[in-house]
């Protein structure tokens, strides 16, 4: 047998390693034999490439599958992949065991109302029965007109959550099917992890995505890691952090705990969880006072010069326009003064007393070091060191980046946490540049893609706003969401909204005209929230009858888990689609549950793991990467895409036979676009639909399209309904040239190679642009501010941009006739320092978490975010002596999310077998707790046990003259498995949320800790 190079290297490496250990006197003969056998097995195996299914770094995998058994025999890192270069974290390295796992249910499971056990059922019985339940509940709860007489065509009785664990193509048909049924309660992981990111970055820059990409971290001069712990939670990203350090970059970590990330940093500063805005606003004050801002950038690329209207005011933590009864702002008070053409008035000297720059100087003057230190618990000298180091990147040839995650997002001020740093990055000129950006570390393999494809109640794919009751016609819908600008230098890219919305609607109902098809879309009630916390509150109140939990475990993942679990008992039926049984599917047999009293009918559908199916996922850096089938789905598991297709076809058949209320959206849904000639899910056909194709012949400029031809770029989409595009930002991903996401070409120009763009490896949205807002990396004539790491440059002789795909094809801004401004997704073309579109203020303001250890703070008399989402029936602990300690949740390297997949993977479970609570030595002494003791953590909402870990890595904080203790717990556990592993951390967390997105505040709440 010929041994290929890769197998030969494996054999020799294994032999060398085992020889070394053999020299220690250890008998390694069995291990040698096993290693040799495994290496030889992979030589003749089918080899496919895939992408890791855990965090959103997007590491490449090579999967070896036995050709005879069609089972995986080995999964390893792909050495050719430019992100991970063959390396994997513990979770990625365990992928083989995830697939080849005896704990995966072999067949669908059914739990009858009142039953205390599962029973196996056939797939046909399950799918037919679920389809019947869907059709029956839809008919019973379908609202054609609301109380005002407005046509809404909405199904109020069914909700669905999930899933960032699905491929893009599965996500798209999933949302299409749900919306055809009339669902508005559509939510998934993004709401409770990074919804704050989208709202903050879209307000600041125009798009809600990570601005740069993982490899680009190596180009940074200073990396600030705050609200994140990348060394443990995104380990392969840290490869690129260390590349930057090797080149001389300064690494900074600001975090409540001293972690593995901290150990590699030049500066570590402790900070009380929930006090980030004070720290970041202090940095803004420092930049402004010391004049460390990049003035040309601030004047030319931001709205610093915009003059704010006379209605703006701010006093004691409240902006103008606040209504105490409704707890909302009249945001018109925050608007800009405008000229006769409707364009904002500007003062480029930045001297006008009401220009944004001057308003900012006034707003931030309160944030002095003494107050910041007193509320954050961070020593003043460390605050100054962080500010000095990071603000040095305000020079044209320097770049600083921020890496953040749940530590910023999961707060009632989550959006403003991110806005605060977004503002600092603009002041320092760090947006659009190599080594800069605001980089959101997403924690689900495809949470970027699932959000792009509209798996949330408020957006359709491509971030198109959803329809509401007050928008009865398609014409009014496009008018509402299409901004108008008369500024000739503003690209105002969202003016193309009608092209994108028409193409989306036509992807679902190509045979209906736009007005008719728009009528099929469900219309939410104006002013009503349908997001995660409200969804489960409505379920708790018995308003929701049927529920899909698709690739998600809300009984553990949502805030106030006891409330969520109780809400599930109020359902008529629930469908749980997952790889393993879990706390959601089996809620009826969980703690404090009496199955006999629970009437919820439960259907558990076992699905395929990532390496068992084909399709694309999009990582945090917006790279859309194609995965191929390795092993077949284990036993009788079925891929999500096929499940969606089967359910959609069955419901269509039922409604075709007995139409009931408005059957047309379901029966006319073009499911033919989803399947191959055999009627099975076809990821390639759906990827082509997402890209978009011509429905009839037409011409754009010199480009002619024939009906059925793939659209090359979203600039060619049409507003008249002659094109499809399931998600306009993905147009260009699957063209007549083929599947761009499947590309593996590492060729680069010298300019691209300097910063590691890899434009031929897979495809990035939009239009394969790797660093968004990149025209802000050059001066007004198109010359790079940092020539040694240029992203784009204007070639005046050839009249074109070189380097990355420019963020807009126009000439530089100095060309007053043809040039356009850099931030094309904002109406005026400028990035927003001052953002009047958010619910809680145009500038970040400090507020305490809804549960906190203080009754006042030094910045204003307003303690909490006055617009935060909360429920009047739920108690909160503010300076409550029963709950004296701050608690925060976090992750460990070996587990992922609620632990549903990793707790069922023996290698990983062995490393982190049960719930623990980290606490300081001082707190342990105070409570008489020793290392390894069992302790009880209790909040207003519930209690759980954990094993105590006493550590020097957590220290008490000095907060306003008093000592405040903090404890930390991982959120990966649940009662169902393993036995004695502990329960969900979210039993303790509050159902309160950010007013912009409803993301829950699970990173700062109050508990008591006692020895069990």
Curated annotation (Swiss-Prot):
Q: What is this protein called?
A: Formate dehydrogenase subunit alpha
Q: Which reaction does it catalyse?
A: formate + NAD(+) = CO2 + NADH
Natural source organism: Megalodesulfovibrio gigas
**Activity over temperature:** Optimum temperature is 56 degrees Celsius.
Every copy of the 4Fe-4S Mo/W bis-MGD-type domain together lies at 45-103
A Pfam family matched by this chain, by name?
Molybdopterin
Signal peptide (from-to)? 1-35
Establish whether keyword Transmembrane is in the entry: no
For this UniProt entry, what is the primary localization, expressed as one broad class?
periplasm
Q: Name one GO biological process term.
A: anaerobic respiration
State its Enzyme Commission number(s).
Answer: 1.17.1.9
């Amino acid at each position: 047998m010929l041994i290929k190079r890769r197998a030969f290297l494996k054999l020799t490496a294994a032999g060398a390693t085992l020889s070394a250990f053999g020299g220690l006197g250890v008998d390694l003969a069995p291990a040698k034999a096993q290693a040799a056998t495994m290496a030889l097995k992979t030589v003749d195996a089918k080899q496919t490439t895939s992408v890791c299914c855990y965090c959103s770094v997007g590491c490449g995998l090579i999967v070896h599958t036995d050709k005879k058994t069609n089972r995986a025999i080995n999964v390893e890192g792909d050495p050719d992949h430019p992100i991970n270069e063959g390396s994997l974290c513990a979770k990625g390295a365990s992928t083989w065991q995830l697939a080849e796992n005896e704990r995966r249910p072999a067949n669908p499971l059914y739990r009858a109302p009142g039953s205390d056990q599962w029973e196996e059922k056939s797939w046909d019985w399950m799918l037919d029965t679920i389809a019947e339940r869907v059709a029956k509940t839809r008919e019973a709860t379908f609202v054609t007109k609301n109380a005002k007489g407005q046509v809404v065509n909405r199904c109020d009785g069914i909700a669905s959550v999930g899933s960032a664990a699905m491929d893009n193509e599965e996500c798209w048909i999933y949302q299409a099917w749900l919306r055809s049924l009339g669902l508005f309660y559509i939510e998934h992981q993004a709401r409770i992890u990074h919804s704050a990111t989208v709202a903050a970055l879209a307000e600041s820059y125009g798009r809600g995505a990570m601005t740069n990409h993982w490899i680009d971290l190596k180009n940074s001069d200073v990396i600030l890691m705050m609200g994140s712990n990348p060394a443990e939670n995104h380990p392969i990203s840290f490869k690129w952090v260390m590349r930057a350090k090797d080149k001389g970059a300064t690494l900074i970590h600001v975090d409540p705990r001293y972690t593995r990330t901290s150990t590699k940093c030049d500066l570590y500063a402790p900070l009380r969880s929930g006090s980030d805005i004070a720290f970041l606003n202090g940095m803004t004050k420092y930049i402004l006072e010391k004049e460390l801002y990049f003035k040309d950038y601030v004047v030319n690329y931001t709205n610093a010069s915009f003059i704010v209207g006379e209605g703006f005011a701010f006093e004691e933590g409240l902006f103008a326009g606040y209504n105490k009864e409704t707890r909302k702002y009249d945001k018109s008070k925050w608007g800009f003064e405008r000229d006769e053409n409707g364009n904002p008035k500007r003062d480029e000297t930045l001297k006008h007393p009401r220009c944004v720059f001057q308003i900012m100087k006034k707003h931030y003057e309160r944030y002095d070091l003494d107050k910041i230190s007193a509320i954050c618990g961070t020593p003043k000298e460390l605050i100054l060191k962080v500010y000095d180091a990071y603000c040095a990147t305000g020079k044209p040839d320097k770049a600083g980046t921020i890496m953040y995650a749940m530590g910023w997002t999961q707060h009632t001020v989550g959006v403003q946490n991110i806005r605060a740093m977004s503002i600092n990055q603009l002041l320092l000129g760090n947006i659009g540049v190599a080594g800069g950006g605001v980089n959101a570390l997403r924690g689900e393999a495809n949470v970027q893609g699932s959000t792009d494809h509209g798996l949330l109640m408020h957006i359709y794919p491509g971030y198109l706003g959803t329809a509401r009751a007050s928008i009865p016609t398609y014409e009014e819908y496009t008018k509402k969401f299409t901004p108008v600008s008369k500024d000739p230098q503003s690209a105002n890219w969202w003016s193309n909204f009608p092209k994108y919305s028409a193409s989306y609607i036509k992807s679902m109902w190509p045979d209906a005209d736009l007005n008719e098809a728009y009528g099929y879309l469900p219309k939410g009630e104006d002013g009503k929230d349908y997001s995660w916390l409200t969804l489960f509150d409505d379920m708790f109140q018995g308003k929701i009858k049927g529920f899909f939990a698709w690739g998600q475990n809300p009984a553990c993942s949502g805030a106030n888990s006891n409330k969520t679990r109780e809400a599930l008992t109020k359902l008529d039926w629930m469908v749980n689609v997952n790889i393993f049984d879990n706390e959601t599917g089996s809620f009826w047999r969980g703690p404090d549950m009496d199955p006999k009293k629970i009437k919820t009918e439960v259907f558990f559908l076992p699905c395929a793991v990532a390496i068992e199916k084909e399709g694309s996922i999009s990582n945090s850096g917006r790279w859309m990467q194609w995965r191929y089938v390795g092993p077949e789905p284990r036993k009788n598991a079925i891929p999500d895409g096929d499940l969606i297709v089967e359910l959609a076809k069955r419901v269509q058949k039922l409604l075709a036979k007995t139409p009931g209320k408005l059957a047309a959206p379901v029966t006319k849904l073009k499911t033919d676009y989803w399947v191959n000639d055999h009627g099975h899910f076809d990821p390639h056909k759906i990827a082509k639909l997402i890209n978009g194709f011509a429905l009839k012949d037409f011409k754009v400029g010199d480009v002619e399209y024939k009906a059925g031809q793939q659209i090359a770029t979203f600039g060619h989409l049409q507003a008249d309904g002659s094109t499809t595009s399931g998600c306009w930002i993905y147009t260009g991903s699957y063209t007549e040239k083929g599947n761009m996401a499947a590309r593996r070409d590492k060729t680069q120009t010298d300019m691209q190679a300097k910063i590691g763009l890899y434009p031929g490896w897979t495809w990035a949205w939009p239009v394969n642009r790797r660093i968004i807002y990149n025209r802000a990396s050059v001066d007004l004539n198109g010359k790079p501010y940092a020539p040694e790491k240029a992203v784009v440059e204007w070639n005046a002789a050839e009249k074109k941009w070189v380097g990355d795909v420019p963020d807009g094809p126009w000439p530089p801004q100095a060309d007053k006739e043809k040039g356009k401004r850099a931030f094309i997704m904002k109406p005026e073309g400028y990035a927003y320092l001052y953002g009047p579109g958010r619910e809680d203020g145009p500038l970040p303001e400090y507020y305490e978490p809804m549960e906190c250890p203080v009754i006042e703070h030094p910045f204003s008399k307003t303690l909490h975010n006055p617009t935060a989402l909360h429920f009047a029936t739920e108690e909160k602990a503010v300076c409550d002596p029963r709950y004296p300690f701050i608690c925060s949740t976090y992750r460990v390297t070996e587990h992922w999310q609620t632990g549903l997949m990793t707790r069922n993977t023996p290698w990983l479970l062995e490393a982190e077998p049960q719930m623990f609570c980290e606490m300081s030595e001082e707190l342990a002494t105070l409570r008489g707790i020793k290392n390894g003791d069992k302790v009880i953590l209790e909040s207003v909402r519930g209690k759980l046990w954990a094993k105590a870990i006493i550590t020097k890595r957590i220290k008490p904080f000095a907060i306003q003259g008093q000592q405040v203790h903090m404890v930390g717990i991982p959120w990966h556990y649940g009662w169902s498995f393993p036995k004695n592993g502990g329960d969900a951390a979210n039993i303790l967390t509050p159902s309160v949320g950010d007013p912009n997105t409803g993301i829950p505040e699970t990173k700062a709440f109050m508990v008591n800790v006692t020895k069990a």
